[in-house]
From Swiss-Prot:
Catalyzed chemical reaction(s): Release of an N-terminal pyroglutamyl group from a polypeptide, the second amino acid generally not being Pro
PANTHER family: PROTEASE FAMILY C15 PYROGLUTAMYL-PEPTIDASE I-RELATED, PYROGLUTAMYL-PEPTIDASE I
Similarity comment: Belongs to the peptidase C15 family.
GO BP, sorted A to Z: proteolysis
Gene for this chain: pcp
Descriptive protein name: Pyrrolidone-carboxylate peptidase
Compartment(s) of residence: Cytoplasm
Function: Removes 5-oxoproline from various penultimate amino acid residues except L-proline.
Subunit structure: Homotetramer.
Major site of localization recorded for this protein: cytoplasm
Organism lineage: Bacteria, Pseudomonadati, Pseudomonadota, Gammaproteobacteria, Vibrionales
Any one GO molecular-function label of the UniProt entry: pyroglutamyl-peptidase activity
Amino acid sequence: MKKVLMTGFEPFGGESINPALEAVKRLDGKKLDGGEVMICQVPVTRYESIDTVVNAIEQYQPDIVITVGQAAGRAAITPERVAINVDDFRIPDNGGHQPIDEPVILDGPDAYFTTLPIKAITSALHKASIPCQVSNTAGTFVCNHLFYGIQHYLRDKSVRHGFVHIPLLPEQDASGNQPTMSLDLIVEGLALLAQAVIDNESDVAITAGQIC
């Protein structure tokens, strides 16, 4: 039985909710085929985010870690391909930090690739008619910071990890101009995503690239 740790960020940037946290809370204790989900709430704070998830990993000893965050402007669930060693925050985090062009980890490598089967994930969600596509940038805010930091922590461990961005909820789109996804569909998608990771020790060879 695989243990799947799924994490979600608290609200930030003036929002009262974060779909990542709302979705993972619904998945707490969910039984999968060959696995079970446990969850962790993550502060949107530069240093505490990594420490919080590392502590959860040490507590739960998971086989798989899936970190989740919201991405305004995206219409699909987007597993991230790569984390980069750059903090360049457009807005302050919830602790008031706003680094500019600073490394996530001093003397760390330029980037880490996900160890989740992102092509298998997109295939599984497409079969369920849930919008999903591979993303090649996790940004330079706390999402990328956490993605990079946890990949660095797990670099010599057998635990698989990757970051997934999800769309806003309809109630977050006050202007009516942003793409959104219902919480029910996000929850369904994340459950299928976790199952795809359990089912695929290695990724499948299908195209998911972009021209630019």
